[in-house]
Amino acid sequence: MSSKLEQLQALLAPVIEALGYQCWGIEFLSQGRHSLLRVYIDKADGILIDDCEIVSRQLSGVLDVEDPISSEYTLEVSSPGMDRPLFTLEQFAAHVGEQVKIKLRSPFEGRRNFQGLLRGVEEQDVVVQVDDHEYLLPIDLIDKANIIPRFD
């Protein structure tokens, strides 16, 4: 996790948790001169649009006061959704047995994109089976990971 994301996580997660939600993850996407700060929240009985609005208002106040982002940005508060992103080893461990799509920051064994069965977590690695090959992907190399929803 980059130091900017760690700083934002440390600032925003306590606010989200104080409101009774779980901070599922944070993404900060630079898009030219304007950036996007996307905050995913969750709770046991699911997230409604009103929940996102409540959290967004509180986070906006904190961000205005603390001013951790020097450039222009848009704050977006969202539920993780069906194709939920995975940020932590704990989240990967909770979704063992599901199909995942993973993009790496840099190539690993000659590739950056992996789509397959999430087999487990070993120390700091995520274990993914693609076809008949098992890959141990270092968590620090993962740029983006999502569950692939099943519609059975």
Curated annotation (Swiss-Prot):
It comes from the Bacteria. InterPro entries: Ribosome_maturation_RimP (IPR003728), RimP_C (IPR028998), RimP_C_sf (IPR036847), RimP_N (IPR028989), RimP_N_sf (IPR035956). One of its GO terms (cellular component) is cytosol. It holds the Pfam family DUF150_C. GO terms for biological process: ribosomal small subunit assembly; translation. Gene3D superfamilies: Ribosome maturation factor RimP, C-terminal domain, RimP-like superfamily, N-terminal. The keyword Hydrolase does not apply. Its main location: cytoplasm. It is found in: Cytoplasm. Keywords: Cytoplasm, Ribosome biogenesis. PANTHER family: RIBOSOME MATURATION FACTOR RIMP. Belongs to the RimP family. Required for maturation of 30S ribosomal subunits. This is Ribosome maturation factor RimP.
